Amino acid sequence: MKVAISKLPDSGWWSKGMPKYNDNPAMIESAIPNLKLLNEERTKLKNVILQNGHDVIEFDFPDELDRKEPKHDFIFIRDSFISDQNGTAVILSARQPTRRIENTIVKKYLRSLNMDIIQMPNSPDLKADGGEFYLCKKDNILFSGLKRNSLQGAQFVAEQLKVKSMVLVEGEGFHLDTYFTPALNKRGRIAALIVCLKI
């Protein structure tokens, strides 16, 4: 498996303070992340991926997102798309308007890997963030949250990925990946679900 991650912005991740999104209780306006810790954790993440026999693809952080008004959320690269894990990516349409530029940029990066691209249509009814999905390929099940995904957006993704089942998960987190994750066994099948019941 190939795992795509973003390099950090040259200016340092939110080195002048992060923004606050109304639907994200974890963000503290103007907070500055601990960049030393961030770099250590990022190195550990890469090592774990490599030690488990997977490849790491590092995309350069886009210059156009590291300017006077930085858009550093791009490091959450999975928010912009979802892959069928077989060479096709669905480019999503972020609910947060300021993040939609990320969808456009990641499409260029994925094309450079010769991936087939499916573009979610630009429609007010179709909204989806990658952090709201888990695709369990071996079981052919798509889990979807509905905080930043619209129901129609989730259905569009399920249709494009040709999944057997889609499970809608309601929770308090702003993204499904903040309170829920499937645990897979060595064969890649769902063995357990890890759920945070209270945030």
Predicted regions and their residues:
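The feature marks the mature, well-folded catalytic cores of soluble enzymes
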Residues: M1-I199
